């Protein structure tokens, strides 16, 4: 018999152990030691009281649905930061039951919509979410680069700043070609501000480009250049500086909107490979 309950009283170490077990055969290799899991959850706005665990007769955690909650596109929203079931308990309806439990729970909290991302080739998961009423919002592409493959050619002086203030953000968002996904949003960056390095290029005292990288994981949540200054090497100069700021050997840019030809071409010219495609999906509650 499986019991469903929130995970607010479950140690993060136990959640991590089940997380690693559940994703051991995942389509994308997961490099997620405990510290990285904790940072990921902090960045995405994880709320244990809104997250569901599936427990067997021995009270062992065999599945989880970890939710974040924050305002998103003008609505109080929940975001699925990770859903998994260990191999020996799959195909028993546990994921569907966790979702139903979570949906009722977050509705009681006043949540208006449920947001998630799913790998497009994960057909069973895509089918499950569609059956639950989720609709596809956007197509995303993910990119990866071996740091050793990149040849630095900086043309512009790059500065590092300690944090991006609200007034600076108001200028930087003008450079965007698309709205960042949940995990790459301003709120997510601010939630884990000390885990990032921030690089900017200025011309005559005005910022014309910026980039942000996770010091440990090598994840770049945002990089953009003023449309009036593109094609001059500013983006490449920023990227070169970002690579110096991370311990990681693999650099990742996740959830690039498939419609953004400019961003995709920029990454491919830097030497990135496109390795995964995802759907951004949402459900109105």
Segment roles from a protein language model:
Residues 2-17, 154-172:
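A short beta-loop-alpha structural element at the N-terminal edge
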Residues 27-52, 56-57, 64-66, 174-198, ...:
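Active-site rim helix/loop that mediates acceptor-substrate recognition in acyltransferases
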Residues 77, 106-117, 246-258:
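Conserved GNAT acetyl-CoA-binding A-motif
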Residues 112, 119-121, 139-164, 259, ...:
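C-terminal "cap" of GNAT-fold acetyltransferases
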């Amino acid at each position: 018999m499986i019991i469903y309950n929130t995970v607010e009283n479950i140690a993060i170490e136990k959640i991590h152990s089940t997380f690693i077990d559940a994703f051991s055969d995942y389509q994308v290799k997961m490099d997620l030691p405990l510290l990285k899991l904790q940072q990921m959850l902090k960045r995405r706005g994880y709320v244990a009281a809104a997250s569901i665990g599936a427990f067997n007769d021995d009270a062992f955690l065999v599945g989880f649905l970890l939710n974040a909650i924050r305002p998103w596109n003008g609505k109080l929203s929940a975001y699925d930061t990770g859903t998994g079931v260990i191999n020996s308990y799959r195909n028993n309806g546990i994921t569907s039951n966790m979702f139903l439990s979570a949906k009722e729970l977050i509705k009681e909290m006043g949540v208006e919509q449920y947001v998630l991302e799913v790998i497009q080739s994960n057909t069973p998961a895509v089918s499950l979410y569609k059956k639950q009423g989720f609709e596809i919002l956007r197509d995303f592409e993910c990119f990866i680069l071996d740091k050793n493959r990149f040849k630095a050619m900086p043309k512009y002086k790059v500065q590092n700043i300690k944090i991006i203030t609200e007034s600076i953000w108001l200028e930087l968002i003008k450079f965007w070609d698309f709205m960042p996904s949940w995990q790459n949003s301003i709120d997510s960056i601010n939630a884990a501000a000390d885990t990032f390095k921030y690089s900017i290029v200025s011309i005559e005292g005005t910022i014309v480009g910026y980039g942000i990288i996770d010091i440990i994981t090598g994840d770049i949540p945002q990089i953009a250049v003023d449309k009036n200054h593109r094609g001059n090497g500013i983006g490449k100069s920023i990227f070169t500086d970002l690579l110096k700021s991370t311990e990681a050997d693999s650099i990742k840019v996740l959830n690039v909107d498939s419609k953004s030809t400019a961003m995709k071409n920029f990454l491919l010219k830097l030497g990135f490979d496109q390795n995964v495609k995802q759907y951004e999906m949402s459900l109105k509650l």
